[in-house]
């Protein structure tokens, strides 16, 4: 564990909370101090759930550590059962309570409650949130699911969706419609929306559809071995992946690979004349491995972007992430340190970032367009509208979401042609984003002076004054070690397209520092350009 201002994943017990909150008839008793009781905030404020999560806490305090914390936990279990009457109970410890080393599973079993008790042993100091959700769902399946006779009609289970997941609610509906269009029934969706009784009948399905490997793959592998149910390997995000998914499901179910794509608009929108400005846009992707790998395929193959960087924060999926990155000629960035991600983005200077809530903050700071493709996300990415990521409608949503932050093609030409215009200048940003118009900056005093008619003496020198001869206002004595841009160099820098201007500025300043220069002139800018072009 480490101290940080931001984390992509919480501790494992947060993953267990996501599983319990997504289910019905399940209650989670968490051995935790008062400081770990933040489930209500996560699910009611961020996800906007209309009811409190089914989580009870022991809420022990410092003074309780000298007494019997085991009795405190048993009282919490007993009270939770009597008050909520769940069909099953999950028990476990938070990262802080793990240090006490109370046997929560044994203590709960000693109560002889009349409902199944699922024991969770989540290593808080080695693993994180997605592992916690994956392991919790696996233990629930092991405790409750059993082999049974298959349904008469071909059916499947949808595995992996949880509470606080990125668009899980809408993905379930979209994939269900896709499967029903193929004549395949959905036996159960788990853990989100499932009760312990639904988990018990998972074995009735003919196969499983794994929607989110981060939170459902362990259960899918267990079901394949124990319940003899194969599971899908393709995540249907994007047009190509959805068609591959349909073919894979058809092979497992023994049906024709047909799907209704009448609502699909993304391919034509991507190929239409007003979308040609997408081609070649440099994009950086970061998030959970499943969404990043799928989004990279959509970005390159379906929208014509150039993928210049990709990575994930969940180390459990480092191997498939690195394998996918090789297909793009890249080395994957696998880290849970947002500062490393920001450093990579600065070095690559992409034109679009596809990431999490953290990448949205980074993009805002760097002035780069951004769209969110993966958890963790904030409240605005739990929309009231229907907005899936999967299936054909999900492909439409991806197009709209990713294109919206970009400057339109015609507007890019206007920025190039009228760079100093009062309306179409670089600082204004894309006009379709609303807000208020940003007026162009007033010319500086030295720039205004240069615009005045030249005197005879100036004409004799070729009509220009070298910056070194008459230093501009901002080129006055700079603090020691600080690099200052001269007017002519600053003006030339503005002629560089805005999406690579930041990188050009950084490279030039690095070049100047290496050469021991404190003032960057036009010549310095050209020398730096030649240096990095080698």
UniProtKB/Swiss-Prot annotation:
<dbReference type="GO" id="GO:0016636">
    <property type="term" value="F:oxidoreductase activity, acting on the CH-CH group of donors, iron-sulfur protein as acceptor"/>
</dbReference>
<keyword id="KW-0077">Bacteriochlorophyll biosynthesis</keyword>
<dbReference type="InterPro" id="IPR050152">
    <property type="entry name" value="ChlB/BchB/BchZ"/>
</dbReference>
<comment type="similarity">
    <text>Belongs to the ChlB/BchB/BchZ family.</text>
</comment>
<feature type="binding site">
    <location>
        <position position="36"/>
    </location>
    <ligand>
        <name>[4Fe-4S] cluster</name>
    </ligand>
</feature>
<dbReference type="InterPro" id="IPR013580">
    <property type="entry name" value="LI-POR_suB-like_C"/>
</dbReference>
<keyword id="KW-0408">Iron</keyword>
<dbReference type="InterPro" id="IPR000510">
    <property type="entry name" value="Nase/OxRdtase_comp1"/>
</dbReference>
<dbReference type="InterPro" id="IPR016209">
    <property type="entry name" value="Protochlorophyllide_Rdtase"/>
</dbReference>
<comment type="pathway">
    <text>Porphyrin-containing compound metabolism; bacteriochlorophyll biosynthesis (light-independent).</text>
</comment>
<keyword id="KW-0479">Metal-binding</keyword>
<dbReference type="GO" id="GO:0046872">
    <property type="term" value="F:metal ion binding"/>
</dbReference>
<dbReference type="InterPro" id="IPR042298">
    <property type="entry name" value="P-CP_red_C"/>
</dbReference>
<comment type="subunit">
    <text>Protochlorophyllide reductase is composed of three subunits; BchL, BchN and BchB. Forms a heterotetramer of two BchB and two BchN subunits.</text>
</comment>
<dbReference type="InterPro" id="IPR005969">
    <property type="entry name" value="Protochl_reductB"/>
</dbReference>
<keyword id="KW-0004">4Fe-4S</keyword>
<dbReference type="GO" id="GO:0051539">
    <property type="term" value="F:4 iron, 4 sulfur cluster binding"/>
</dbReference>
<protein>
    <recommendedName>
        <fullName>Light-independent protochlorophyllide reductase subunit B</fullName>
        <ecNumber>1.3.7.7</ecNumber>
    </recommendedName>
</protein>
<feature type="region of interest" description="Disordered">
    <location>
        <begin position="426"/>
        <end position="446"/>
    </location>
</feature>
<keyword id="KW-0602">Photosynthesis</keyword>
<dbReference type="GO" id="GO:0016730">
    <property type="term" value="F:oxidoreductase activity, acting on iron-sulfur proteins as donors"/>
</dbReference>
<dbReference type="GO" id="GO:0019685">
    <property type="term" value="P:photosynthesis, dark reaction"/>
</dbReference>
<dbReference type="GO" id="GO:0005524">
    <property type="term" value="F:ATP binding"/>
</dbReference>
<keyword id="KW-0149">Chlorophyll biosynthesis</keyword>
<dbReference type="Pfam" id="PF00148">
    <property type="entry name" value="Oxidored_nitro"/>
</dbReference>
<keyword id="KW-0547">Nucleotide-binding</keyword>
<comment type="function">
    <text>Component of the dark-operative protochlorophyllide reductase (DPOR) that uses Mg-ATP and reduced ferredoxin to reduce ring D of protochlorophyllide (Pchlide) to form chlorophyllide a (Chlide). This reaction is light-independent. The NB-protein (BchN-BchB) is the catalytic component of the complex.</text>
</comment>
<dbReference type="Pfam" id="PF08369">
    <property type="entry name" value="PCP_red"/>
</dbReference>
<keyword id="KW-0560">Oxidoreductase</keyword>
<keyword id="KW-0067">ATP-binding</keyword>
<feature type="active site" description="Proton donor">
    <location>
        <position position="274"/>
    </location>
</feature>
<keyword id="KW-0411">Iron-sulfur</keyword>
<dbReference type="GO" id="GO:0036070">
    <property type="term" value="P:light-independent bacteriochlorophyll biosynthetic process"/>
</dbReference>
<feature type="binding site">
    <location>
        <begin position="409"/>
        <end position="410"/>
    </location>
    <ligand>
        <name>substrate</name>
    </ligand>
</feature>
């Amino acid at each position: 564990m480490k101290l940080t201002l931001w984390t992509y994943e919480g501790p494992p017990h947060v993953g267990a909370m996501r599983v319990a909150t997504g289910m019905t008839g399940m209650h989670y008793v968490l051995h935790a101090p008062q400081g770990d009781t933040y489930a209500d905030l996560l699910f009611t404020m961020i996800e906007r759930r209309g009811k409190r999560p089914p989580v009870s806490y022991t809420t022990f305090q410092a003074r309780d550590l000298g007494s019997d914390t085991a009795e405190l936990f048993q009282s919490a279990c007993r009270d939770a059962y009597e008050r909520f009457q769940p069909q099953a109970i999950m028990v476990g410890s938070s990262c802080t309570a793990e240090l006490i080393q109370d046997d929560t599973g044994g203590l709960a079993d000693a109560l002889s409650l009349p409902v199944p008790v699922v024991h969770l042993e989540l290593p808080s100091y080695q693993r994180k949130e997605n592992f916690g959700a994956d392991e919790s769902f696996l233990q629930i399946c092991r405790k409750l699911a059993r082999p049974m006779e298959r349904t008469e009609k071909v059916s499947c289970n949808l595995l992996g969706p949880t509470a606080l997941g990125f668009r899980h609610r809408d993905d379930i509906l979209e994939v269900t419609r896709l499967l029903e269009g193929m004549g395949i029934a959905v036996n159960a969706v788990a853990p989100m929306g499932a009760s312990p009784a639904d988990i018990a009948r998972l074995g009735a399905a003919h196969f499983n559809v794994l929607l989110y490997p981060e939170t459902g793959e362990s259960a899918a592998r267990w079901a394949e071995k124990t319940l003899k149910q194969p599971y899908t390997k393709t995540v249907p995000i994007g047009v190509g992946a959805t068609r591959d998914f349909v073919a894979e499901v058809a092979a497992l179910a023994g049906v024709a690979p047909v799907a209704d794509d009448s609502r699909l608009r993304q391919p034509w929108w991507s190929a239409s004349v007003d979308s040609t400005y997408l081609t070649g846009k440099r994009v950086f992707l970061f998030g959970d491995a499943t969404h990043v790998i799928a989004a990279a395929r959509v970005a390159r193959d379906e929208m014509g972007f150039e993928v210049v960087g990709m990575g994930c924060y969940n180390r459990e999926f480092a191997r498939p992430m690195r394998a996918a990155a090789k297909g793009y000629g890249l080395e994957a960035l696998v880290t849970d340190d947002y500062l490393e991600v920001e450093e990579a983005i600065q070095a690559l200077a992409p034109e679009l970032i596809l990431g999490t809530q953290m990448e949205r903050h980074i993009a805002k700071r760097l002035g780069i367009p951004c769209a969110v493709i993966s958890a963790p996300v904030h409240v605005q990415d739990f929309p009231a509208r229907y907005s899936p990521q999967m299936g054909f409608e999900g492909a439409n949503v991806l197009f709209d979401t990713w294109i919206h932050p970009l400057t339109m093609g015609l507007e890019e030409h206007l920025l190039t042609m009228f760079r100093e215009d009062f309306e179409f200048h670089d600082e204004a940003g894309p006009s379709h984003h609303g807000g208020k118009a940003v007026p162009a900056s007033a010319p500086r005093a030295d720039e205004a002076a240069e615009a005045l008619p030249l005197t005879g003496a100036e004409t004799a020198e070729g009509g220009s004054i070298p910056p070194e001869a008459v230093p501009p206002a901002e080129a006055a004595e700079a603090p020691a070690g600080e690099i200052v841009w001269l007017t002519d160099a600053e003006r030339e820098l503005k002629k560089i397209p805005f999406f690579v201007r930041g990188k050009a500025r950084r490279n030039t300043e690095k070049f100047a520092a290496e050469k021991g220069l404190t003032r960057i002139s036009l010549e310095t800018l050209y020398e730096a350009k030649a240096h990095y072009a080698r």
